[in-house]
């Protein structure tokens, strides 16, 4: 039995070595064309060169660490803001807030103050929509574009998911419920 085992082990080792050699030889093929991205421009976010906004420029917003702002497709930074705690930014608005935020001023991409949100909570900007997640984690408010409260919803379970569109919003709760609201809160 020992002799038979030695022969079978040497057979399988030899077979494995032959398979590996054949695999290496047959698997060799030239690599396809590789695509490499080369940047058209770079921005040093430690000390950006802020330039005035041109009227025909399409703005792109960014949030990186404790900084946020807007830049053009040409790479010109037109607004650069540092914030101490948290912030929210969209194509139309930006704001920063603290952990015990009682109100938050919000601004347009060109740094003009558009209004104040006088609701205790955490603002979220999504395109041209303003939401405030209220303390406790189970409620939110929808605001008008001047920051005044339009309507509010309070649930029993904490909010775990949220998405909005021009037609309303969808909220997911920790108990598994998903609720859809139109723009009027129905």
Predicted regions and their residues:
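A short beta-strand motif characteristic of beta-propeller blades
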Residues: 35-43, 74-82, 105-118, 147-154, ...
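Extracytoplasmic/periplasmic C-terminal soluble domains
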Residues: 145-186
């Amino acid at each position: 039995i020992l002799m038979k085992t030695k022969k079978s082990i040497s057979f399988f080792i030899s077979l494995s070595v032959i398979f590996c050699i054949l695999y290496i030889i047959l698997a060799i093929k030239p690599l396809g064309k590789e695509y490499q991205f080369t940047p058209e421009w770079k921005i040093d976010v430690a000390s950006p060169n802020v330039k005035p906004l041109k009227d025909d420029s399409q703005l792109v917003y960014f949030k990186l660490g404790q900084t946020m702002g807007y830049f053009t497709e040409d790479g010109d930074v037109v607004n650069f803001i540092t914030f101490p705690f948290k912030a929210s930014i969209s194509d139309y608005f930006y704001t920063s807030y603290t952990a015990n935020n009682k109100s938050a001023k919000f601004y347009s991409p060109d740094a003009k103050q558009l209004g104040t949100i006088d609701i205790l909570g955490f603002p979220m900007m999504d395109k041209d929509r303003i939401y405030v997640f209220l303390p406790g984690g189970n409620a939110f408010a929808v605001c008008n574009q001047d920051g005044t409260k339009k309507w509010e919803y309070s649930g029993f379970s904490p909010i775990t998911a949220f998405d909005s569109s021009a037609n309303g919003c969808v909220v997911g709760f920790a108990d598994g419920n998903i609720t859809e609201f139109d723009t009027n809160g129905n």
